[in-house]
Amino acid sequence: VNWRRIVWLLALVTLPTLAEETPLQLALRGAQHDQLYQLSSSGVTKVSALPDTLTTPLGSLWKLYVYAWLEDTHQPEQPYQCRGNSPEEVYCCQAGESITRDTALVRSCGLYFAPQRLHIGADVWGQYWQQRQAPAWLASLPTLKPETSVTVKSLLDSLATLPAQNKAQEILLDVVLDEAKIGVASMLGSRVRVKTWSWFADDEQEIRQGGFAGWLTDGTPLWVTGSGTSKTVLTRYATVLNRVLPVPTQVASGQCVEVELFARYPLKKITAEKSTTAVKPGVLNGRYRVTFANGNHITFVSHGETTLLTEKGKLKLQSHLDREEYVARVLDREAKSTPPEAAKAMTVAIRTFLQQNANREGDCLTIPDSSAMQRVSASPATTGARMMTAWTQDLIYAGDPVHYHGSRATEGTLSWRQATVQAGQGERYDQILAFAYPDNSLSRWGAPRSTCQLLPKAKAWLAKKMPQWRGMLQGETGYNEPDVFAVCRLVSGFPYTDRQQKRLFIRNFFTLQDRLDLTHEYLHLAFDGYPTGLDENYIETLTRQLLMD
């Protein structure tokens, strides 16, 4: 009898019991009552009403309340200066740099929000929150600490009525977009706007628990906790949270877009759908028929957002739309709401094109409805288009100019036809975007910035070397030369490869070591999906063979 084998098999059988997964808990405010979900990494294991007695430590959430007070009372900005004196500055900035309010909230810089530094008095604080019927723990400045335990229900109550929450929601999208949280934006899109938190799960302060709390894009409060830090909770459970969290279909950005419908086609007459009498200029409500000067016609629906105007004797249709409704209508006109991943990518491209090309008149963006810009449906967006748009609300792909086309695929141009093929192959929306726009980065509307500081000389060197290496590398099992990629400057840490975005991060491009790093990371990308792509010894040996030959 092979006793070693029997012991090994018994260990495998008992292993799941010994290392049983602690379920993730998700509290979500509902229309009738709050619900508590228990989730494993594979799905929902239990759903029940949220107990009034369930508690949570505040952890880093106290900073969100200080942020809300600062914003709502219009306190002047007081940047925190990092001097290298405190280990807590690792969450804030490098020595010699400073950090402002919005960034401090995203990075969870407690030193910035310290009430003593900001000269927040306990009396002023208490009066402010008591006037807003806040929970007792929130109105007491001395108890606003990470270790303070509060009921989850009272936490959701406070989030539902939190002052300045629209501003907080806008800023907290950056938490999901943090590149260190790999795969989170890919799985969740922009649907959650949350402040992360971590604290200790035991009195000995040896076991960590973490999670996040905040809102869905429609303002629904939520709270999450699980074992580990907030970062591990987000990355580990992003996939199952994607399946559980609802996608709102009535979401507004608060920003208006003025669109001249049918801008390139002269209008002859507009009538009610079942009438031959021309309607008079003014706000339109109902179903209408447009007859063009060339004899063609089309019907459309208006619920008061479209106005018939006359300018210099010519008819003109002007629609006043919310930005997200505009994106959804363009999706209906230029593409479709399926397959979902292709549609999500398209909404990001549409929104980015709008930001890069629209003009401004007062508080509104202005853009014509034309094939030279973006074509937009004259009727309200379909439910499917609104869902895809809500899934990516506020997301743009910042960097180089963005274009798209029904069938043509070139660098800098997303092909809808190719995007549908990529979606069918299992690629997610951010991978489709990275293929079309390799030098751009997923970002938010209010802060369009590319996280890739391009190293064009490094990319040009690699592009020149790839044909020279091809003969040798094609003999290696698993080699698949990437079609597109970007080479980016590494701000800190060690060189690495972002396989999803097809990006190679290196420190610089001056020395032999830089070329070794670039080649090494390129090979990780070229062997992605094959075991050798994860074998550091194999990759390093091959790197030196390529550069030393």
Predicted ranges, named:
Residues 19, 171-193, 197-209, 213, ...:
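Conserved, single-site charged/polar hotspot
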Residues 20-49, 212-217, 221-225, 484-486:
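A short, well-structured edge-of-sheet supersecondary motif
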Residues 22-24, 80-171:
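Active-site-adjacent helix/loop patches that line small-molecule binding or acyl-intermediate pockets
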Residues 31-38, 478-512:
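Catalytic zinc-binding patch centered on the HExxH motif and its immediate surroundings
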Residues 55-78, 104, 260-264:
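Active-site SXXK
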Residues 73-74, 522-538:
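Catalytic Zn2+-binding segment of zinc metalloproteases
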Residues 502-518, 528-534:
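Short pre-active-site segment immediately N-terminal to the catalytic Zn-binding motif
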